[in-house]
Amino acid sequence: MATIAGSRAPTEVPSHPYTCNTCQVAFRNSELQRGHMRSDWHRYNLKRRVASLPPISSEVFTEKVLQARAATTAQADKAGFEKTCEVCQKTYYSENSFRNHLSSTKHKSKAAAAARRPANNKVDDDVSSMSFSLGEPARADSVVDSEAEEEFSEVVEGIKNASIHDTASPIKRPSAPQPAVEEQSKTDAQMEETPTTTPKPEALTPSATTCVFCNYESPTPQLNASHMERIHGMFIPEKQYLVDLEGLLKHLWEKVFRYNECLTCGKMKVNVFAIQTHMRDKSHYHIPYTTEEEQLEIGEFYDFRSTYSDGDWETEEEDKGEEDGGVRLGAKRESKVVDENGDEVMEDEEGWETDSDASSLDTDDLHAVPAEGHYHQYERLGKHPHHSRENKKAHREADGIHAPSKRTHAVYYDEYELHLPSGKSVGHRSLARYYRQNLYHYPTPEERAERLAIEAAERENRMDVDGEEPERGRTRTRALVPRDIKGLGVTTMSDPRVRGIVQKGKKEEWKNRDSKWWMHSQVAIKEKAKHPSTYLR
């Protein structure tokens, strides 16, 4: 009887039991598999697998590494490019820009001009002499130092050792290859032999004929000052006391040309052109003369002795000040008080009030004191023709206009109205709220004159026989009736006919009043009512 084990075929042991499903390769032992897991090829295939891309073989990966090395070397060569055009004195750090410059018309014209110029008469321009280079380009035939080779090898190793979790790029920008130590020492020796001659600026001489704003040259200092005053608007303070105009102009010249400082605000710039542009843009053309320091700065060019009192400037203090080089601009002098006889009055040192200082009038009576040399103005008011009571003629006409017999002067009757010669009255603005009222039924001067005439006629008719005017106020037209006979009399209103006539008259009166009111309202809408302030009250 055959057993099961005997019937089975012997199992074959695989030669490469360890595999990598990502790269689709197999290995004989685990050591090779673990080494493959740490290689750049496997890491690159892992990245492609994450991106859903198929894996690549080791040959394709090697080609990609060589291409990356070539690109890195080209970038390093491009970054280290530096060439200088000797004709144009310009340095270029890009090969394309250098080629474009060589093919430009400007470079060719300068090269042709340099070829025609004799070699012994070549003189550098000011601009070319001031140009400098940041570094000398590396020579093609120089021996490259071993440190540069090590740096490039480190870059290549970094590509191999790159991992997925690395955040920074393993490629590091290499520096330009440095020449060997022997070549560097030769270059240093040549630079030491070349003498460095820096031109020293010549000492500037102050000029009183040069304009500090536009560099205009004038024949004389006086014409220079006139030019700056008329053209630029410069103001010289205290010109009547100026004794040294030339010294003042030189002082301003040194301040601008030597110290590059603004005359007005004191701001400093890098050169003369910058400070002149600043003064022109800001209109800083005047010389400051407000504070004591500013006055002392230019005080040596002035002479104020003519403003001193006699003998004041001949004291010892002035002599001492002149020896020390100081300048006196004048001191405060005490005021002298002289009485009527011309004698000097000594003032009280402590400042107490005297009898002459205090007023001899009461404070309450000060408003009634007339002006000195004039009598009270109210006494002359009655003598004025406009307010005279001796003139019997009417003050105004019937229409309210001033009578021609009166002089036409604008006068005040009170504090709120001004009566003009034309007859109109101008009200005070404090009463404007009342003047703005639209009074439709305000009577005109003609209507008021008519009413006054009617009232005067009625008053004359009611006068008594003796000529006495009846009592003003509410008139009592009803007769006094005793209480015992009240109601016995018969009035006219008890008659129906009389009552009808009276009611009809009242209706007509109301009708006329309504129609008149409607007409007045229509007129008031079409044309503005006259201002009440124009009427004479």
Curated annotation (Swiss-Prot):
Annotated Low complexity bias: 192-204
Residues covered by region (Disordered): 101-151, 163-204, 312-361, 382-401
Ranges of compositional bias, category Basic and acidic residues: 323-339
Gene Ontology biological process terms from the UniProt entry: ribosomal large subunit biogenesis
Keyword flag Metal-binding: yes
Zinc finger intervals, C2H2-type: 18-42, 83-107, 260-284
Description of how the protein assembles with itself and partners: Associates with nascent pre-60S particles that have not yet entered the translating pool, and is released from mature 60S subunits.
The protein's name in its UniProt record: Cytoplasmic 60S subunit biogenesis factor REI1 homolog
